[in-house]
Amino acid sequence: MTFTKSVDQTTILQGDRSKLKDLLRVRLNACGWNDQVRLLCRETIKDQDTVNCDALVQQVTPKARALIPDTVKKELLQKIKAILIQQEGIDI
């Protein structure tokens, strides 16, 4: 079993996954990331004649991920580590 699968299974079973998703949603909204991605989508659509949803997602996703502040990434990682340590006693 890979580490990622272990994290997924552990967080799903313990109900922490939704808490982590809520935290991420709040932090991204607070730093203006949602607005940045919305503008990025508008610019992408405006620059092309026809864009379907799948193509838009493919084009915007890498740029949107790069816009996530390091502080948000670090906070989420710390929360995940704390959950794993608390639940599994995993030494990371």
Swiss-Prot record:
The keyword Transcription applies. Component of the nuclear pore complex (NPC)-associated TREX-2 complex (transcription and export complex 2). Component of the SAGA transcription coactivator-HAT complex. Within the SAGA complex, participates in a subcomplex of SAGA called the DUB module (deubiquitination module). GO terms for biological process: chromatin organization; mRNA export from nucleus; protein transport; transcription elongation by RNA polymerase II. It holds the Pfam family EnY2. InterPro entries: TF_ENY2, TF_EnY2_sf. This is Enhancer of yellow 2 transcription factor. Keywords: Activator, Chromatin regulator, mRNA transport, Nucleus, Protein transport, Transcription, Transcription regulation, Translocation, Transport. One of its GO terms (molecular function) is transcription coactivator activity. Involved in mRNA export coupled transcription activation by association with both the TREX-2 and the SAGA complexes. The transcription regulatory histone acetylation (HAT) complex SAGA is a multiprotein complex that activates transcription by remodeling chromatin and mediating histone acetylation and deubiquitination. Within the SAGA complex, participates in a subcomplex that specifically deubiquitinates histones. The SAGA complex is recruited to specific gene promoters by activators, where it is required for transcription. It comes from Culex quinquefasciatus (Southern house mosquito). One of its GO terms (cellular component) is DUBm complex. The lineage of its organism: Eukaryota, Metazoa, Ecdysozoa, Arthropoda, Hexapoda. Transmembrane segments: none annotated. PANTHER family: ENHANCER OF YELLOW 2 TRANSCRIPTION FACTOR. The keyword Transcription regulation applies. Its main location: nucleus. It is found in: Nucleus, Nucleoplasm. Belongs to the ENY2 family. Coiled coil: none annotated.
